[in-house]
Amino acid sequence: MRVWLVCMVGLLGGLHGSNVEESEDMKKVRKIFEKAFSRKLYDSEVERIRKLEKELCLDTRVMIPFIFHGDRVVALPTTRYQDVDKSEKKYVEKVVVQLRWLVWRLMAWVYVPGGSSWIRDLINEVFEATVSRDPDPVSLYKGARRRSGIRLMDLVMKVFKQNVSMVSEFGQRLARSAEDRIQGIPGSLSPEERKKEEEMLRKIKEHGERLCTKERQEEMVRAQEIICDVCAYVWERDEDRMSFIMEVYSRHLCLKIVMPYTDIEVPLISYIDHHKLVSTDEKYKSMNIMAEVFKQAFIEHKGIDDESINNAVREVRERKRLEEMREMEERKRREEERAKNEEELLRMVEREKREESKGRGKKKGGKRGAGEAKEESKEEDGKEEEGVEAEEEESAEVPLVETAVGGARRKKSLKGKRKGDGHHYKIHSRVLRWKRSAEKIKRELDKGSEERWKNRSIEEIKEQKKVHDIVEVSELIKSKECDRFFFRTGKYMKGGSERWKMVANGILEEGGEKKVGKVEVGLFKGERGESVVYHLMFRPTETERAGMVGGSSFGKGDDVDEIKKEESSDMSGFRYPPGVRCEMTSNGNEFRIEYRNPKNTSEVLRTLTILRIPEI
């Protein structure tokens, strides 16, 4: 949770010029965070913010080299200026022209509790004194002296290297200013307050001195270089591309909701430990491992520590082992196929020899020999026809029975499935229970086998009902439009069943507030091979990043230990209680579900909008 809070302070304060770090009124801080989270903060979260406000933060950050415009990715790490869509070039230039300042704020990031205007002024002074010396980023990106221009990731690295000279200047002045403030600590402070103030200023001074060292500057540049290379590498991997871009898009949606007044969607800033990142790269020298470390830090919100690094190494080695097994099986299959072809070729040669021999016998044996040869030829032709008929019987259509969500049973065949047909699923009872009243849900949960759901208050159940009672999403996942909205994750085994997820970006609106998050659909393979939905919810972004309730949407795993496989339904005859209505609409880019007040259907209680996968 602390990383998420620090990240929000950085995004709201450091990156976009808010005075979050200077606020003396806790109510103002709370208001900013509640707008970001689109809900009232829990007491525990308020307490964490209070603690955070009192802590010095020198966390290191990196830039994710993507440019979004609305729901489109208009520039990838490897995109050159001439490859940008003509209609988006002016917009991309508006983003690129800000790169020097954005990168500088990233490199000079210091969060100081209480009044820190002296640091902000220092950051501005150093930047304004040196910015005019270096080439304009837009000119660099256009590549005036080069036909091909440079890639976006190369431009980001050039700006980082240009800013290194400012880092030394900033570090020296930061250390001097911190020392001056140590000497000027008011004598009116109590011994405890004086000690605390001095400790904080000494840490700032030490940070400034480290910024002056060649090692720290090289580490800063190298960390960003690793991120650029990893982003480009992950983007090229089919199995990772979609989850990566959906996470990037989700973060952009968060910023747009928090700051609707901004018309430029700048590249994302992410908190990543530079030292851990660089040392891991030096130790393993493996792009596969670095990509896995980055995925865990950025997509699955796990941070970089010894445990996550070890997990990444194990994941890569296991993936390599499985790939080697598949390659061995493929080689074995090819060898068996080659041997089979050779045997078939030998049989053909032998058959041709027999036919030639029979032809010679015909000339020698007269009419009788010819008749015998003809009879034998008929017998062989008959055997071949029998073989063909047997093969046709084996490949004949086998009738299957599939169950559509909310529909009747229908017969299908392996060859008879039409291209326009949708997907077919069963719905588990643990999903359907959320359509009941909060009181009935509580009674069922208290008697159930899932310990984490027991003894919840009615208020908690009502809050959970808002994000779980979305069974209408099944109308989208069974439709042929499903793949435009949902991304399918890799399969994994848990509780004796094969499971996987479908994930989409979404926005939940209630009471004039919006929450950005993921719409999660958890599925498992039933005993008859059917796909069963056992988990369905809208997971707000802040709970995902804070590690609350099940972790990342894209992670391989879930918090449901055991599923009673027999408790599923095809949704036939399902109806809400009388008077409750919702309206579903889709325009191809958004699938919208409006939940209305049963007593006044003109009143919309909440709206869930599922967004199409970003256009690339």
Curated annotation (Swiss-Prot):
Residues 350-427 are annotated as: Disordered. It comes from the Eukaryota. Residues 382-396 have a biased composition (Acidic residues). Residues 408-427 have a biased composition (Basic residues). Residues 350-359, 369-381 have a biased composition (Basic and acidic residues). Belongs to the UPF0329 family. This is UPF0329 protein ECU02_1540.
